[in-house]
Amino acid sequence: MAKKASDHVKYYNNPDGPVIGTVSRNIIERDGLYFKDLDGSGEYQPFDDWRLPAKERAKAYVKVLSTDEKIAQLFISDWRMGKYPCGVEGHQVVFDESGILDDAWVHGKNIFGEQHLPGTTELIKDWFARHLILRANPTPDDLADWINQLHAVAEECPHFVPVQVVSNSRNENGETVFGMNDAAGVFASWPGTLGIAAAVRGCGIGLVDDFADCIRREWDAAGLKKGYMYMADIISDPRWQRSYGTFGEDPKLVCEIFSHLIPGIQGSSHGVTADGVAVTVKHFPGGGARENGFDPHYEMGQWNVYRTEGSLSKYHLPGFQTAADCGASSIMPYYAKPSKEKSAPQTDKDGNAMELEPWGFAYNKPFIDGLLRRQMGFEGYINSDTGIVHNMAWGVEMLDGPERVGFAVNQAGVDLISGLFDHQYGREAYDRGRNGYYDTHAVPEGFKKEELVLTEEALDRAVSRTLTELFALGMFENPYRDPKKAAQTVSDPRDWDHAMDVHRKSVVLLKNDGTLPLSREKIKQKKVYAECFYKDGERAKKATAKLREDLKGGLFCLTETYEEADYAILMLYPSSGEYFSATKGYLELDLCDEKPVFDVDTEGRPSGTTHLETTLKGVKRIRKIAHAIHGNGGKVIGNLNITLAWEVGSAEPYLDALTAGFDTEQSAVLDVIFGRFAPVGKLPVTLPRGDEVLAVDQQGVCVSPNDVPGYDKDKYMPESLKDENGKAYAYRDTAGNYYELNFGLCII
């Protein structure tokens, strides 16, 4: 294809019906209406008819597709834009004739697996891949051009199926992290999801409607029609690194948020619409019940542990029930598998004992088919987490690749497998059900042949479910978007202003002895010292320079010498651990610099050796700075960026005022500090009081239950740890306030 698709889309307007957009596909006229010729027959077929229900069209169209075309649609994987770096060292882009698609072969390798991949045109035409994950961070017009080009290539295939480009969320501020927060800063940038929760608690649920509507309009304008978003997981183990991305620890609040978020993004409360964006809710049945923070991206974190009776249904399932009730288009199971040996009895929605089969949740029929579908009433499709066939195949390691595909799709009920384009495994799983493979090969112990092969029935079920989404989104009729309109929509200053307003509303005032706000009268002609603290010292220096630049021009005098200052403003941005790899010990939550902490053994128990951990470089200097400022009769203000439930005891006692943000814009925090905006946010998560409430014994059991949210942990804590108010878990500051769920001060 030599032409740029965006410049050659032809549109056909239907009265009281959808616009049909095409670059090269035949258009059928019938009853005075226009329909796209999906199967290339040149004749009207019922599945061409946009007047029919999406599910009906999908079930009819799946019968037309070849076996290989259907198998290809079982898989979704990362894909690259030619104009933007693909992350593969040494890769040389070979553009197609349009100058948009990368048609070079590439050897792709990441933490999810390894694969030799063709160019984009070949992937779409010959492999018939139709589900791609975008991790690049392009401009909206480049994104629309690229997606348009993908659809135009797909139109040249005998059977037209549009290309579904999927992304993790793009509308929150924060540090970009592969596989978690791939892109930020292009689409309207709201605070992190914890900040959204903090603002909702302070200002009401209405802002979620605005947040969702912004996402829907921006994504639809650019042609992005599905998002891996958002997380209905509850924070119950504070050491879980994916606390970032959740809406906190309160199941009721998560349910309330999702009851507005899903319909707002998808376009209705009954599923997706043509101007909506499909939502994939993560990570069923909740990833918060970790075993002392270990993450299932690596082997030590492969278990979900429910040590508290009934915790699964009480805390972890409600958000997913709301997702099912609101018509979420798809749900993503977590990598982990449940531990029967380490868990107390858990019940399903009907009060029956749950089968805690030791299979990853994407392979776990009792959870996916029995609980989620039959009892919770979920009607969308199941989209696995990325890498379940290769590096994160917890519980089914004894199966080979084709058997894992067959077991996930045929037995557990997965409809879309994220990771690599494993169509060859899918074909082998399909053929093994027909070629007598298991007449000469042993069936792995504990499994049955019919569980491990890919049946026609399971294949059609899975593909018809994903096709239903594409039909409902209107992508068969018109998948094309105007790049100029995409750029205009995403740059709308009203959305950016609204997002900034929520940044301000997300700020939580944790401590104040009358220091805040820093009014004109307080700071006029005063000397102010400002510094940023990070885990990385070099990053802290750069951030400090920017902070000081932002503070120039005020009524006060900036000084780089804290010994002479009247006020200090300290911005604290701690971080801990790695997303995809295990730490030597338990994930550190203390604000510390080279703190000796225990290693863990291969079973996840504390060992006798130690190593040094840093979450906030130079944190010990806060005490020195405070001593000097207080000696001058001055005040120290701190702001803590909460991405995890930090232990704040090494900083809070030295601060006269303390605010908290959640990947909140620094300018919004300064608006609160200087009295330009009154703080209204409330904590969406409890901050633990210290290491003593997170201690793990020699059996690997934490003193505070990892499957219970912070607000309820005191019910299960030893009496010896409780204070005179019966509280053990939450941090209590020097003013006597507990930093627990929903806490936040006001300025009167």
Explain the meaning of each model-derived region.
Residues M1-I748:
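Glycoside hydrolase catalytic-domain context in secreted enzymes
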